[in-house]
């Protein structure tokens, strides 16, 4: 058996903060796992160092399921983003090791490919509708078959999903959280105009997506869904705060627009009721925050029973290690829907060389043994951790609101 003899946490900031777990075995094979939790990176790093790594030494790296259960059930204080991100990092690293020892890419260990490639969607954003459509046309020219649309709202200085750079979006700021002002009425007026302009310019052969980011009430989300139905949205993401899961039933009663949720979910228990009551169309749970490949497969299997597809979170707050793991999962799972893909900064790609590729709107994890991603530790050491926080929202009267 390949015995775990050591493990360490690597923290680096090549454009943004990433936490990586590296597990070493007595056979000279190592595996990598992403342990990044945006804005709470050091909490996961400490959890791994103090509470997880000591429990890994001497264990059989091939016993992925047993180690998953050990870390989950042995924690007693189960679930939550810190615990599940730490477990996910271990899980990814162990799949990486297993693939390297077997000489196979991880997707082959998951049952093989269910498709030739993974359809991904890019992010088109701009301060105006015109700017956003221009960027969307650029993505379409690059071969993207699905594009997320976000644009600035007149009268609001800053809006979620809109970056200063048309490709690289990183909302976290150094020092203390930025406080933005939010107006729901203005937002509800601009989004249908954005979709109308996009359809007129891009046509009907491209999927259009939108992220509400938890900021609407159920009835507001239903209204927006109705307004967007003529433009055939691929999905509305995070229409309302996911803690109130019964709210999705009310949204369902008012619109046929497909609903997606789950990027903040940490376990199958967070998604179970939404799936079994068929209140969503896409489950957005991601590898690093939902317990790794092992647990995400369980969530997907449950969703498959109800014809609900996957649509994993894939923003730049996940490292290329997680992106690779997601693509192996996507390629193998039968009820795959779509994969979010935000390109990383060149500095990030240099620190994390990877085998996955993009062509004609599709991605593939590559056929290198394991996950097909590595870390240049010398280069990573040159990018020191920088404390950063995600923004917060306030209504115009000063009331705290969902970002």
UniProtKB/Swiss-Prot annotation:
Q: In which pathway does it act?
A: Carbohydrate metabolism; pentose and glucuronate interconversion
Reaction it catalyzes: D-mannonate = 2-dehydro-3-deoxy-D-gluconate + H2O
| Enzyme Commission number | 4.2.1.8
Recorded hits in PROSITE patterns, A to Z, give:
MR_MLE_1
Q: How is the cofactor bound?
A: Binds 1 Mg(2+) ion per subunit.
Molecular function as annotated in GO: magnesium ion binding; mannonate dehydratase activity
User: Function of this protein?
Assistant: Catalyzes the dehydration of D-mannonate. Has no detectable activity with a panel of 70 other acid sugars (in vitro).
Extract the PANTHER family matched here.
Answer: D-GALACTONATE DEHYDRATASE-RELATED (PTHR48080), STARVATION-SENSING PROTEIN RSPA (PTHR48080:SF6)
Record protein name field:
D-mannonate dehydratase
């Amino acid at each position: 058996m390949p015995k775990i003899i050591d493990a360490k946490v690597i923290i680096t900031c090549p454009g943004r903060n990433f936490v990586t777990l590296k597990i070493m075995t007595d056979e000279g094979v190592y595996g990598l796992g992403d342990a990044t939790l945006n804005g709470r990176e050091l909490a996961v790093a400490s959890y791994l160092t103090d509470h997880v790594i000591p429990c890994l030494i001497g264990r059989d790296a091939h016993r992925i399921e047993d180690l998953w259960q050990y870390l989950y059930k042995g924690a007693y204080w189960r679930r939550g983003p810190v615990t599940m991100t730490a477990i996910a990092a271990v899980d990814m690293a162990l799949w990486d090791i297993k693939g390297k020892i077997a000489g196979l890419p991880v997707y082959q260990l998951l049952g093989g490919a269910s498709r030739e490639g993974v359809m991904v969607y890019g992010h088109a954003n701009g301060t105006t509708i015109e700017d956003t459509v221009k960027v969307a046309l650029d993505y379409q020219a690059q071969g993207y078959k699905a594009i997320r649309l976000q644009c600035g709202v007149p009268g609001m200085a800053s809006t979620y999903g809109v970056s200063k750079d048309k490709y690289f979006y990183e909302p976290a700021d150094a020092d203390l959280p930025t406080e933005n002002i939010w107006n729901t009425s203005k937002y509800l007026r601009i989004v249908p105009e954005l979709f109308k302009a996009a359809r007129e310019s891009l046509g009907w052969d491209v999927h259009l997506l939108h992220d509400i980011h938890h900021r609407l009430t159920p009835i507001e989300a239903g209204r927006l869904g109705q307004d967007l139905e003529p433009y055939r949205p691929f999905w509305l993401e995070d229409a309302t705060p996911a803690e109130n899961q019964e709210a999705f039933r009310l949204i369902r009663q008012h619109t046929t627009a497909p609903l997606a949720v789950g990027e903040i979910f940490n376990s199958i228990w967070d998604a179970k009721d939404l799936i079994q009551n068929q209140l969503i169309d896409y489950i957005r749970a991601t590898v690093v925050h939902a317990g790794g490949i092992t647990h995400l497969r369980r969530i997907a299997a449950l969703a498959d029973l109800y014809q609900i597809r996957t649509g994993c979170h894939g923003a730049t707050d996940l490292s290329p290690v997680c992106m690779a793991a997601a693509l192996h999962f996507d390629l193998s799972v039968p009820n795959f829907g779509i994969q979010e893909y935000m390109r990383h900064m060149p500095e990030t790609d240099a620190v994390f060389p990877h085998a996955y590729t993009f062509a004609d709107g599709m991605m593939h994890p590559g056929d290198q043994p394991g996950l097909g991603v590595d870390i240049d530790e010398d280069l990573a050491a040159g990018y020191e951790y920088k404390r950063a926080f995600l923004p917060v929202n306030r209504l115009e009267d000063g009331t705290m609101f969902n970002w």
